[in-house]
């Protein structure tokens, strides 16, 4: 019996959240084409052979002077020291400089490399990228190309991870998919809908708080608040005659329905908190951890 923790590490938009959902065969982590979508660590639990692999989806590694972004990167780096194995995730189109920066981080755990989005590249491009990493073959244990869309090489990756998990009893019930509670997942799904429906800088000055969840026999009622930092962004989120907030609600319900069998009643309000994304204590307490 084996059990251990694996941290998913990589730049923003490398495909870490998509990879986690793929490994779980279930959507628990928000996915967006926008950078820095993942703001808090989410644990996903995968059973493979006689092992339990607990994957930690971390915020992407990036450079920024903003308080929120700095704390996100700190959370990602901290997870490196807490894990048995690291999985560096990079798109086949990513510059290898990102991997060099990763190697400069202090780490004791072994690591694998997952090269994602190979379905979008030619065989020539894939082989060229794999060859780039061979310069550092003494650093990593294995490099695995992956396609989430085509569902390719999943078991090869899990077999490699299995080799490096420590002998240990399971940390969680094998039936669990995640350590996140429903509110945390709902919050991420609503935020994903915000990212889908509004553009530019609005999502980066926005977060979501799930105020209340009421479970009834045939319906789940979710009451949430979108928090933003100024009147202009609030107006954009609501939209003319409330059309944007309505669209956010429709999209969020669709995403939440991938997880729940019940009907969904979702009530979303929008409020302003000018300091939410610059106050370190607020971020740590309510959003990041």
UniProtKB/Swiss-Prot annotation:
KH type-2 domain residues: 198-274
Subcellular location: Cytoplasm; Cell inner membrane
InterPro entries assigned: G_ERA_dom (IPR030388), GTP-bd (IPR006073), GTPase_Era-like (IPR005662), KH_dom-like_a/b (IPR015946), KH_dom_type_2 (IPR004044), KH_sf_prok-type (IPR009019), P-loop_NTPase (IPR027417), Small_GTP-bd (IPR005225)
Segments of this protein annotated with the region G1: 10-17
Binding, GTP: 10-17, 57-61, 116-119
Segments of this protein annotated with the region G5: 146-148
Keywords: Cell inner membrane, Cell membrane, Cytoplasm, GTP-binding, Membrane, Nucleotide-binding, Ribosome biogenesis, RNA-binding, rRNA-binding
Spans annotated as G3: 57-60
Region (G2): 36-40
Region (G4): 116-119
GO process terms (BP): ribosomal small subunit assembly
Domain of life: Bacteria
Role played: An essential GTPase that binds both GDP and GTP, with rapid nucleotide exchange. Plays a role in 16S rRNA processing and 30S ribosomal subunit biogenesis and possibly also in cell cycle regulation and energy metabolism.
Protein family per UniProt: Belongs to the TRAFAC class TrmE-Era-EngA-EngB-Septin-like GTPase superfamily. Era GTPase family.
Oligomeric and partner information: Monomer.
Protein name as annotated: GTPase Era
Organism for this UniProt entry: Campylobacter fetus subsp. fetus (strain 82-40)
